[in-house]
């Protein structure tokens, strides 16, 4: 009887361990998807500049268009609704991400190089060109019954590269 109990315990332990490893691997995959989506979205957004401002070599962001572009690219890469950022059916996410900070530094409000510091989000960067700073909070889904979803904050700094 004791060997049956031991075998049963080992089977339960193996399934529990497998579930924990699966959850950790899925969290890693989702985190990399978030990072890649943030890079793509910010790269797209920093290209939205006022066309006439590039003629003199001092580009100025069209902030409204850049914000819309950021949201659209982020949504397309993460399975979210582009206007509300709410998760679409079959999305990895169950909670809409929140853009908690979005700042634009260009020739209208800074000279370069510009030293940007935001202690709240751990950003300390020297901006050599017009740049966008965006911070988004994501609720990471859980794939294990005993692991609660948790929130991560992802900061991103992206500079205008020109055309």
Predicted regions and their residues:
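Alpha-helical assembly-interface signal, strongest on the long, hydrophobic N-terminal helix that forms
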Residues: 1-68
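Short amphipathic secondary-structure patches
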Residues: 40-128
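Low-complexity, S/T/G/P-rich flexible repeat/linker segments used as non-globular hinges
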Residues: 105-107, 111-163
